[in-house]
Amino acid sequence: MPGAFTKTCSALHLPGYIKNYELAIKKGISKIVCVAVNDPNVMKAWGENQNAGSKIFMAGDPFLKFTKAIGAEVDKSEKGLGIRSNRYTMLVENGEVKKVEEEKETATCELSSAESFLKSI
């Protein structure tokens, strides 16, 4: 996700996966990981703020190592956010990427929303 505590991430994207956790498990998903370009302490606080509990593993990517490795970095400097991750949802099975839904804009959460993604798998 683009960033902890940001508008779309906090209002739609992360809450959607928390709300649909049971459906994800029923569809065979064993772990939901939320990755954002923030440090681990911010991710922990955001998870607590969103009541993610043990449903979502909150993973910080402060140096963009993962984000750059998958080619998801996007420059949001004009909004004062610097380099961030694009908004996407990825299905990984046994270390292999099976499906990716990536938004054209970080403010959009349609293809990558829990509801849309879970319907598509």
Write out the residue ranges for each language-model feature.
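Chalcogenol-based redox active-site neighborhoods
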Residues: 1-121
